From Swiss-Prot:
Name recorded for this polypeptide: Methionyl-tRNA formyltransferase
Lineage of the organism: Bacteria, Thermotogati, Thermotogota, Thermotogae, Kosmotogales
Residues where (6S)-5,6,7,8-tetrahydrofolate binds: 109-112
Pfam families according to UniProt: Formyl_trans_C, Formyl_trans_N
Gene that this polypeptide is encoded by: fmt
InterPro entries named in the record: Fmt (IPR005794), Formyl_trans_C (IPR005793), Formyl_transf_N (IPR002376), Formyl_transf_N_sf (IPR036477), Formyl_transferase-like_C_sf (IPR011034), Met-tRNA-FMT_C (IPR044135), Met-tRNA-FMT_N (IPR041711)
PANTHER family named in the record: METHIONYL-TRNA FORMYLTRANSFERASE, METHIONYL-TRNA FORMYLTRANSFERASE, MITOCHONDRIAL
Annotated GO CC locations: cytosol
Family listed: Belongs to the Fmt family.
Length: 311
């Protein structure tokens, strides 16, 4: 079975590595074009490209795989199946109908919920108690094709974007190998999605990561953990913009302060008042500096009880 793999970030790269480790015949890899990063604007290869190079797999980075040279390169590979994981572009009919076994995507949500680019962050931000991995057959819609396999996992109160992404990546790799075994044996049965239950997970914008109001402790907790450890939620501290990490639920906090006011600072965390309830925060990042604990920030006289965040 000749596999063409399409993906771009580290989440996808881990799936590609698993395929190679399990001795699957990956005949080609498609990834988004390299992007300039850092002060020197040096072109950095995508994580998927790095893994493909490591194993000597041909890599293609066309502006579009749906037409022109990109599509011609794909046709020449004569894949039996295409697997996509966070590739970053919608595929047209001529692409997903090319391989005899079809074109399948590994998606980090329980479809039809959270179709789109940022399912992990949006699930956390909305306070979901569970999520999962769905492998589905690609059609002309966005994450709307029939489901081949799906498995759910619990979202714990300790999870943030980093920990949940790792859990889902491990589940995705396991499910992908299971899927390939089943499709090779002709054992895959497709189940149409219930489109009436669809929700969406749009791409993250800068505005999404800004925290203005400390209105509800649970909402603030979910927002901070949805973008922890990257890119971090930004809020105001006087004239500065700081990033907050390590949020926790403050169940038994006695709150009698203005929203955004720091009530207390301990070695573990600081408690910040909200209109409803409060939130614990353990780490903070000042502009141009490394992430430090709130206790280090207090010891360095960067924060103190009584000052306000937000606005």
């Amino acid at each position: 079975m000749k596999i063409v793999f399409m993906g771009t970030p580290d989440f996808a790269a881990e799936h590609l590595r698993k395929l190679v480790e399990k001795k699957y015949n990956v005949v080609g890899v498609f990834s988004q074009p390299d992007k300039p990063k850092g002060r020197g604007k040096k072109l950095i290869p995508t994580p998927v490209k790095q893994v493909a190079r490591e194993y000597g797999i041909p890599v293609f980075q066309p502006k579009s795989v749906n037409k022109g040279e990109g599509f011609e390169a794909l046709k020449e590979l004569k894949p039996d199946i295409i697997i996509t994981v966070a590739y970053g572009k919608l595929l047209k009919q001529q692409v997903f109908e090319l391989p005899p076994l079809g074109c399948y995507n590994v998606h980090a949500s329980l479809l039809p919920k959270y179709r789109g680019a940022a399912p992990i962050q949006r699930a956390l931000e909305n306070g979901e108690k569970e999520t999962g991995i769905t492998i589905f057959k690609i059609d002309e819609g966005m994450d709307s094709g029939p489901i081949a396999l799906q498995e759910r996992i619990e979202i714990s109160s300790d999870d943030n974007f980093g920990t949940l992404k790792k859990k889902l990546c491990n589940l995705g790799k396991k499910l992908l190998i299971e899927f390939l075994k089943k499709i090779s044996a002709g054992e895959i049965k497709l189940t149409p999605q219930d489109h009436s239950q669809a929700t969406y997970a749009p791409k993250i914008t800068k505005e999404d990561t800004i925290l203005i109001e400390f209105d509800n402790g649970e909402r603030v907790f979910n927002k901070i953990r949805a973008y922890d450890p990257e890119p971090g939620v930004t809020t105001r501290l006087g004239e500065l913009r700081v990033k907050l990490f390590g949020a926790g639920i403050c169940d038994n906090c006695c709150v009698d302060a203005e929203p955004g006011q720091i009530i207390s600072i301990s070695k573990d965390s600081m408690v910040v008042a909200c209109k409803k309830g409060a939130v614990k925060i353990s780490k903070i990042q000042f502009p141009g500096k490394k992430v430090i604990t709130v206790w280090q920030a207090k010891s360095g006289r960067l924060i103190e009880e009584g000052i306000k965040l937000g606005g």
